[in-house]
């Protein structure tokens, strides 16, 4: 585990973004942990989050020239990544996002921000559950003449999707592009084991993974 990944887990815990307990997910599964990037809700938090996304993309050697944020949650995430690229890598990368509702006046259309045509986009989101929002974003990008270079997420839960493979793997197969997480469930387990995490919490996560983890 890299230092930035350990820092990210610690920061997520401090902010209450990552919590342990009993949580019912949209899938109906009862999870021993919950991850809510909506609590990265200040300038300092978004700045740190953006830098972590950038670090993961750089280490994965992703070649891209546009950052795309699916509405609504992905919009501040994409903005944070674009700013972090400028601040830490001296790269002035344009960004764009979509509207949930088509605008029929002014500039109109579904997309806001930089032109997508001819660009290699990184789609930025928090996690991948069903993958629907990611696939919709990819369709918008390709319809506008762009391509998807990668998908950047904060956490890969490494859970099964519709089949035995993970929802992340399903997205990779569908888009033909890699999914790059800041951390995975592997990193979280390692962090808890190395930092004296409560034994019952770590056991609960391992039991959950044994039941719902991807093959």
Curated annotation (Swiss-Prot):
One of its GO terms (molecular function) is orotate phosphoribosyltransferase activity. The keyword Manganese does not apply. It comes from the Bacteria. It is an enzyme of class 2 (transferase). Pfam families: Pribosyltran. SUPFAM superfamilies: PRTase-like. This is Orotate phosphoribosyltransferase.
